[in-house]
Structures are given as structure tokens and as C-alpha cells.
From Swiss-Prot:
GO biological process: apoptotic process; cholesterol metabolic process; low-density lipoprotein particle receptor catabolic process; proteolysis; regulation of neuron apoptotic process
Keyword Kinase attributed: no
EC number(s) from the headed UniProt entry: 3.4.21.-
Subunit field text: Monomer. Can self-associate to form dimers and higher multimers which may have increased LDLR degrading activity. The precursor protein but not the mature protein may form multimers. Interacts with APOB, VLDLR, LRP8/APOER2 and BACE1. The full-length immature form (pro-PCSK9) interacts with SCNN1A, SCNN1B and SCNN1G. The pro-PCSK9 form (via C-terminal domain) interacts with LDLR. Interacts (via the C-terminal domain) with ANXA2 (via repeat Annexin 1); the interaction inhibits the degradation of LDLR.
Subcellular location: Cytoplasm; Secreted; Endosome; Lysosome
Annotated SUPFAM superfamilies: Protease propeptides/inhibitors (SSF54897), Subtilisin-like (SSF52743)
Protein name: Proprotein convertase subtilisin/kexin type 9
Organism: Gorilla gorilla gorilla (Western lowland gorilla)
Region spans: C-terminal domain: 448-690
Keywords: Apoptosis, Autocatalytic cleavage, Calcium, Cholesterol metabolism, Cytoplasm, Disulfide bond, Endoplasmic reticulum, Endosome, Glycoprotein, Golgi apparatus, Hydrolase, Lipid metabolism, Lysosome, Phosphoprotein, Protease, Secreted, Serine protease, Signal, Steroid metabolism, Sterol metabolism, Sulfation, Zymogen
């Protein structure tokens, strides 16, 4: 896909002024953009009033889309440092214009951001990037790029719990207290499915269509937006039939928009929220572009303001982490499945996958409102449709419990999903362990879920292959990191540990010499009023295993991890299991440092479960019983034969290398260690409600 066709050529300023002096040139410029001549004169008049920015070097960086066909060179988002005020943003923009004019270049400020993030959108020559990066307050600059719509009645039955399944879809809550913002094409608001439920705002920021010099009217191309509005809240085919919606037009008739247009749309939502605070807000982003630091940052700001953002994973049959806003950690990212709960295939492409996907939802042959007429319906497919389902489910959950935080909502979506129903063989082999096997579903009840201890598994990005490379996994701000583990496909790793970073604990994993890289795996939980700490025991004396326990009164063990400096711990037979009667203890190899995660919270109780098997098995699992939640997952022994340990739902999985490549003997054993916790106070509260 090419760049937007309206991009202008850039002329040196003296030549441009000569052209403006001539009658023909003046008329042409006036037709093209009437305010350019006034801008040139204004810049010349204030040129002497603005001093040059100091050029003592800069820490500002430049970013652009990795997908070359999606780039829009000539338009740039200049992001300023977080504490920059609006007046400083405006002065920085004027300074850029004045200094560019001194060098013979014309620039145009298209938008000044404030309220969501500080910065401005500028149209200028790429020759000015070095100058712009040295301006005061600049944090980074990102070249604009394109984003695209992600669309190419079984679906309502699929997301409904069995106890509610009947001849009609009748969810326990319609989402009437929630407002959903849709950033898409426009919407045919008089369609009988959504009439009276959707307000079409006056917001519009779309690029010209490829091969044209004009915008078609929104009413001529509102199929995608109309369909998604119907999926979210349609009278007959909608998920949250009581939710109200507002639409912002950020995609043109070809389903194409820009990162900058999406940013301005998100800023519009934030300003609306500040001017007229309402109840819970859900923002549906059924679009995808290349990875964008600035778009992810804007999503983060809006999420931290209390807005729930749901986005399409993308339809490129690729790692969702390569796309935005799908890669933003604060966004709920949704992949697409079909009626058989299998990943959606769209020609040679299909749903995206990987660690940045939170869950999947129905996204193939979804019946919804059509813009062809006010009573027409049409079938569409894609991760846009899947995201619309989750936006509807989120609206119903928030309507039932308006005080839910983003972290609480995400944990509930994961907890109540259908598990282990997707055929993982569809995904690339290296993505199978990273991709969640979850299909969205409504909870059996939208009330009473608060008594459960919710946890999820968060994978880091893959580290580099160098010996000292590390990977870091982080929990959301409202979550507690209760345990840390690591995984390497080659088995060449040096373990993991928890450390404080920016006032929060993070999980750091270490690659080993000759390794191909490592993943850090965090177990992130909702644990109100928790007080957690990490206790470490250094490598033990020869002939002894290393042990560490929770020594603070009232603290219980929630996770164990180990880290070693040697390249190969060798074998350890049999695995060192903890002595009976000492549950609050982590044990490990004598040459490793052992770390115990210890937490105190009202009514928190935990227990350890172990399951060991002899070689040659390459995987061992152990699960927590119903009513208990997996908080920790680790392996014994922690040797280089073990690929790593990770949690899937409530099960601890430990994998080892192929026996034929390790030289292991049948005398050696492999054990999975699960730590299972629950809150007695929450359980008692639930029993009282019943």
C-alpha cells in the first residue's frame, strides 16, 4: 500500500517566495492552501525573536514503521517530555518553524496535542529531522504511518455460558451503564439494529483515498463501522444490547487511516471525558498498523485515566507484537476464531497470534448490520469482529460492576474464557507456547466473582542470543508479581530472579553462553492489601542443596525461582524436594542462588504441590485443585536439561530437552512444583453471599 496521495513536494523557501510573487504562482498556492503565504511572512517576522536551540547533543530518538509500504514520510509526530506544558509545546513548534525557515524550508503544524500526551503533528521535509530532534523538550519523533480496518449467529451462542443457553441469547446484563467509543469508518445510524443507540460525533480525521484527490462522504462507505456497531450493541445480533455508542471517523472509505489521526481521536475521547465525566468507558480500536511507540504511549495514557481499550490483534497471520495498538500492554488484544473454536484463516493470511494477544473471540462469518439499507444484514470476518465481541462482553461486565479496574476486567475475561479448545498446530511452532489458548465467554454471573484470587501468566519479549542477554516480564500497575520463571528452547539459560524496578517487582531471566535467547515469565495476580518481598539464599556449600524460606511472621510462600552463574549446572538426582512439615521453603541446586517470593495479605493461605516423573518424559505437569489459584511454577532440578517452567491457567508445566540430545539416564527425574493459593476472607465472603 502506498503513501497518502496528498503528500506535497518541498521547495527551498527563496524559490517558493519567488513563485508566490508571480500571479500564477500566487493563485496556485492559494488554491493549494490559502494560509501558506501568511505563514511564511509570520515565520520571517518572528525568526529573530527565537534563539537557536542548543546543539550540545540530544537523547531524542527517531522512529518509523517497519512496514515500508505503510510509511507516510513528510508527516511526523513530535512527542515532548511528559511534564511539558501546552505553552511550551506551542513554543517548540514555532521554534521548529522559524529555524526551518532560516534554512529555506517551509513547515506546517497540523495539530498540537494536549490532554493525552504533549507534542505536535508537523508536515515537513525529512531533511529537518536532525534539527527537530535537538529542540528543547523533545522526547522522540515518529514518522506517521497507515492503520487499516481488520475485517475481511453462531457467535452469540459461543460466548454464552451453558446455563444461559436457550432458544434466544439473553445475557445477564445488557451493558446499559457503559458507553463504547468506536474509532472506525462512519456509521449508518438509522439502521434498525442500532437506531437510537449510536451517536455519530463530528470527529473526522482521515487521509485521502489512494488514487483520488477527494474524500467520499462518510455515508457512502460506512459498512465496516456499521457492522461493528451492530456486533457490539445491535438489537438482534449484538452482544451488549443495552450499551450506547459514539463513533469517531478515523478510517476512510478504503478502510485506511493514519497513526496521527488515531492519536487525535484518542485525544478527543480524553478531552470529552474531562469535560463531561460519565460512567465506565470502553474504546474499540478495530484497526492495526505497524508497531508505533507513540500510539502505544497514547493508549497507555488513556488506560491509566480509567478507560478500557479493546483492539484487533490484526489479520496478518503474524506476531501481534509487531503491530499497534495490538502490542500495547495496557490494551486488551483480541485474536479471531471460527465456529469450531479454531484460528481464523483469511486467504493466505489469518488472525495474528503470540504473547501480545490476551484472548480470542468469534471472528469468522459474523452476521451484523449492513449499510446497504436500514434493514440489511451482512456477514464479515476478521479480528475487528472478534474485538467487537470482547468490547461487548467488557461493557456488560462493567455495567454490572462499574468500579472494576482494567486489571480486574482483564483477569476476569481470562478467567471465564473457554480454555484449551484451540488447535495450537495452526500457529508457528515457536509461537504455540506464547499464544493463549483462550476463547472469550461471558461469566456465568456478572456478580460475585470478586471472591476469587485471579492470576495470569505474562511472557516477556525474547532476549538476545548473547551470554549476558536478559529478558524482563512486568505485571500491570494494579497487579502483584507473585512468582518468576524462565524458558529457553535450547535449555541454555541461567535461571531467573525478581528485582525491584521503578517501585515495582519485575521478573528477569538470564541467557547462557551458546543459548538462543530466553523468556522471562511473570505470574501476575490481583491481591489487594498485599505486602510482598523476596528472600534470597546464595549458593550453598558443596554437597548441600540451597534452601530459603519465608521468615517473616504471617508471610506465605507464593513462588520460587533460581539463578546461577555457571554455564551448566549438570545433573541433580533425585530432585531436591522440600522436607515434610516445611511448606514455606524453596530448595534448589547447590550452585544456584534461590529466591523465595513471600507475601502477606488478609486471609492468604498457600500450599505446595509437587509431581515428579523419571526420564525419558519431556514434560511434567501439576495442577491446583478447584478453589485454589496457581501463583508459582518452578522446576526441579534447575539444570540445563530443563527448558523451563510456566503456568497455563491453573497448571504448572515443566519441559525438558529431548532425551536423545542430553545423555540423561533413566535414573534422573524431573519434577514440577506448583504453589497454590487462596484467600480465606474472599471464600468466606462468597459463602455468605450464597
Amino acid at each position: 500500500m502506498g503513501t497518502v496521495s496528498s503528500r506535497r513536494s518541498w521547495w527551498p523557501l527563496p524559490l517558493l517566495l519567488l513563485l508566490l510573487l508571480g500571479p500564477a504562482g500566487a493563485r496556485a498556492q492559494e488554491d493549494e492552501d490559502g494560509d501558506y503565504e501568511e505563514l511564511v511572512l509570520a515565520l520571517r517576522s518572528e525568526e529573530d525573536g527565537l534563539a537557536e536551540a542548543p546543539e550540545h547533543g540530544t537523547t531524542a530518538t527517531f522512529h518509523r514503521c517497519a512496514k515500508d509500504p505503510w510509511r507516510l514520510p513528510g508527516t511526523y509526530v513530535v512527542v515532548l517530555k511528559e511534564e511539558t506544558h501546552l505553552s511550551q509545546s506551542e513554543r517548540t513548534a514555532r521554534r521548529l518553524q522559524a529555524q526551518a525557515a532560516r534554512r529555506g524550508y517551509l513547515t506546517k503544524i497540523l495539530h498540537v496535542f494536549h490532554g493525552l500526551l504533549p507534542g505536535f503533528l508537523v508536515k515537513m521535509s525529512g531533511d529537518l529531522l536532525e534539527l527537530a530532534l535537538k529542540l528543547p523538550h523533545v522526547d522522540y519523533i515518529e514518522e506517521d504511518s497507515s492503520v487499516f480496518a481488520q475485517s475481511i449467529p453462531w457467535n452469540l451462542e459461543r460466548i454464552t455460558p451453558p446455563r444461559y443457553r436457550a432458544d434466544e441469547y439473553q445475557p445477564p446484563d445488557g451493558g446499559s451503564l457503559v458507553e463504547v467509543y468506536l474509532l472506525d469508518t462512519s456509521i449508518q445510524s438509522d439502521h434498525r439494529e442500532i437506531e437510537g443507540r449510536v451517536m455519530v460525533t463530528d470527529f473526522e480525521n482521515v487521509p485521502e483515498e489512494d488514487g483520488t484527490r477527494f474524500h467520499r462522504q462518510a455515508s457512502k462507505c460506512d459498512s465496516h463501522g456499521t457492522h461493528l456497531a451492530g456486533v457490539v450493541s445491535g438489537r438482534d445480533a449484538g452482544v451488549a444490547k443495552g450499551a450506547s455508542m459514539r463513533s469517531l471517523r478515523v478510517l476512510n472509505c478504503q478502510g485506511k487511516g493514519t497513526v496521527s489521526g488515531t492519536l487525535i481521536g484518542l485525544e478527543f475521547i480524553r478531552k470529552s471525558q474531562l469535560v463531561q465525566p460519565v460512567g465506565p468507558l470502553v474504546v474499540l480500536l478495530p484497526l492495526a498498523g505497524g508497531y508505533s511507540r507513540v500510539l502505544n504511549a497514547a493508549c497507555q495514557r488513556l488506560a491509566r485515566a480509567g478507560v478500557v481499550l479493546v483492539t484487533a490483534a490484526g489479520n496478518f497471520r503474524d506476531d501481534a507484537c509487531l503491530y499497534s495498538p495490538a502490542s500495547a500492554p495496557e490494551v486488551i488484544t483480541v485474536g479471531a476464531t471460527n465456529a469450531q473454536d479454531q484460528p481464523v484463516t483469511l486467504g493466505t493470511l489469518g488472525t495474528n497470534f503470540g504473547r501480545c494477544v490476551d484472548l480470542f473471540a468469534p471472528g469468522e462469518d459474523i452476521i451484523g448490520a449492513s449499510s446497504d439499507c436500514s434493514t440489511c444484514f451482512v456477514s464479515q470476518s476478521g479480528t475487528s469482529q472478534a474485538a467487537a465481541h470482547v468490547a461487548g462482553i467488557a461493557a456488560m461486565m462493567l455495567s454490572a460492576e462499574p468500579e472494576l479496574t482494567l486489571a480486574e476486567l482483564r483477569q476476569r475475561l481470562i478467567h471465564f474464557s473457554a480454555k484449551d479448545v484451540i488447535n495450537e498446530a495452526w500457529f508457528p511452532e515457536d509461537q504455540r507456547v506464547l499464544t493463549p489458548n483462550l476463547v472469550a465467554a461471558l461469566p456465568p454471573s456478572t456478580h460475585g466473582a470478586g471472591w476469587q484470587l485471579f492470576c495470569r501468566t505474562v511472557w516477556s519479549a525474547h532476549s538476545g542470543p548473547t551470554r549476558m542477554a536478559t529478558a524482563v516480564a512486568r505485571c500491570a500497575p494494579d497487579e502483584e508479581l507473585l512468582s518468576c520463571s524462565s524458558f529457553s528452547r535450547s535449555g541454555k539459560r541461567r535461571g531467573e530472579h525478581m528485582e525491584a524496578q521503578g517501585g515495582k517487582l519485575v521478573c528477569r531471566a538470564h541467557n547462557a553462553f551458546g543459548g538462543e535467547g530466553v523468556y522471562a515469565i511473570a505470574r501476575c495476580c490481583l491481591l489487594p492489601q498485599a505486602n510482598c518481598s523476596v528472600h534470597t539464599a546464595p549458593p550453598a556449600e558443596a554437597g548441600m542443596g540451597t534452601r530459603v524460606h519465608c521468615h517473616q511472621q504471617g508471610h506465605v510462600l507464593t513462588g520460587c525461582s533460581s539463578h546461577w552463574e555457571v554455564e551448566d549446572l549438570g545433573t541433580h538426582k533425585p530432585p531436591v524436594l522440600r522436607p515434610r512439615g516445611q511448606p514455606n521453603q524453596c530448595v534448589g541446586h547447590r550452585e544456584a542462588s534461590i529466591h523465595a517470593s513471600c507475601c502477606h495479605a488478609p486471609g492468604l493461605e498457600c500450599k505446595v504441590k509437587e509431581h515428579g516423573i523419571p526420564a525419558p518424559q519431556e514434560q511434567v505437569t501439576v495442577a491446583c485443585e478447584e478453589g485454589w489459584t496457581l501463583t508459582g511454577c518452578s522446576a526441579l532440578p534447575g539444570t540445563s536439561h530443563v527448558l523451563g517452567a510456566y503456568g497455563i491457567d491453573n497448571t504448572c508445566v515443566v519441559r525438558s530437552r529431548d532425551v536423545s540430545t542430553t545423555g540423561r539416564t533413566s535414573e534422573e527425574a524431573l519434577a514440577a512444583v506448583a504453589i497454590c493459593c487462596r484467600s480465606r476472607h474472599l471464600v468466606q465472603a462468597s459463602q455468605e453471599l450464597q
